[in-house]
C-alpha cells in the first residue's frame, strides 16, 4: 500500500517491500542484464538470506520526503530475515521477532538537470547507510557480534547526448558505486566503476 501526500512531496509505503527496488539503485546500471550491477554484494552477502531483495520482499515501511524537485530523502525499516526460499517457499512467512533483527536503511538523493527546462546533462548522487540489528557471526573467529552496518555512494551522470535525443534516453552514461561495511563483521566490501 502506498499513500502520497502534499502534492507527492511525502510518500509512505507499507507492506511486503523489497529494498532493491527503492535503495542502492543506479539508473545507468539498470540497463545491464548482468546481476553484478544490480543490488550490490555489499548488502546481499552481509544480510541474513540475502536481505530483502528479489524475488521476495519482507514486511516493511518506507517514508520518502521530496521537499524540492532536486532532493529526496528516504528511510525504511524492514523485517530482518526473509528466511531461505526452501523454508519460505511462497514469500509469506513473516516474523517480527527481535532475535532476527531489523534492517534500517536511509538514502539521500541529489539530482541535477532533470527537468525539460534544464540545459545541462542530467545526473544523480546518492549517499546511504544501513544498519541490521541481528547478531552476526564473525567469519574469522565465530564470535557472535551485535549488529552490522555499512554505507554507500552512487553517482550517475550523462556524459554525452546528441541534440534532440532527450526523449529516447540514448547517449553516453557513466556510473560509479562505492561502499563499505563494518570491518571484520562480514565478508565483502564493494567498488563498481564501469565507464
Feature names for model-found ranges:
Residues 46-49, 89-97, 140-142, 180-184:
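Extracellular loop and loop/strand-boundary signature of outer-membrane beta-barrel proteins
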Residues 6-9, 70, 113-124, 160-172:
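Short loop/turn motifs that connect adjacent beta-strands in outer-membrane beta-barrel proteins
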Residues 55-59, 100-104, 147-153, 188-192:
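Residues that define the transmembrane beta-barrel architecture of outer-membrane proteins
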Residues 7, 20-24, 81-85, 114-116, ...:
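Gram-negative outer-membrane beta-barrel proteins
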Residues 12-18, 73-79, 123-133, 172-180, ...:
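Transmembrane beta-barrel strands of outer-membrane/channel proteins
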Residues 1-3, 61-65, 106-110, 153-157, ...:
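Residues on the lipid-exposed face of transmembrane beta-strands in outer-membrane beta-barrel proteins
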Residues 1-82, 186-190:
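Outer membrane beta-barrel
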Residues 68-136:
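Loop-centered beta-sheet repeat module
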Amino acid at each position: 500500500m502506498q499513500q502520497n501526500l502534499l502534492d507527492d512531496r511525502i510518500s509512505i509505503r507499507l507492506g511486503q517491500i523489497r529494498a532493491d527496488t527503492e535503495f542502492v539503485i543506479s539508473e545507468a546500471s539498470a540497463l545491464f542484464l548482468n546481476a553484478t550491477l544490480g543490488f550490490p554484494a555489499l548488502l546481499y552477502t552481509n544480510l541474513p538470506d540475502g536481505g530483502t531483495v528479489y524475488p521476495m520482499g519482507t514486511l516493511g515501511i518506507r517514508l520518502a520526503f521530496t521537499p524540492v524537485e532536486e532532493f529526496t530523502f528516504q528511510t525504511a525499516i524492514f523485517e530482518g530475515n526473509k528466511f531461505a526460499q526452501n523454508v519460505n517457499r511462497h514469500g509469506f512467512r513473516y516474523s517480527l521477532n527481535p532475535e532476527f533483527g531489523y534492517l534500517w536503511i536511509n538514502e539521500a538523493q541529489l539530482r541535477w538537470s532533470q527537468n525539460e527546462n534544464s540545459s545541462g546533462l542530467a545526473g544523480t548522487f546518492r549517499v546511504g547507510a544501513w544498519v541490521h540489528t541481528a547478531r552476526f557471526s564473525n567469519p574469522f573467529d565465530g564470535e557472535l557480534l551485535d549488529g552490522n552496518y555499512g554505507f554507500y555512494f552512487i553517482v550517475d551522470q550523462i556524459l554525452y547526448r546528441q541534440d534532440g535525443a532527450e526523449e529516447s534516453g540514448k547517449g553516453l552514461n557513466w556510473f560509479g558505486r562505492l561502499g563499505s561495511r563494518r570491518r571484520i563483521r562480514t565478508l565483502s566490501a564493494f567498488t563498481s566503476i564501469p565507464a
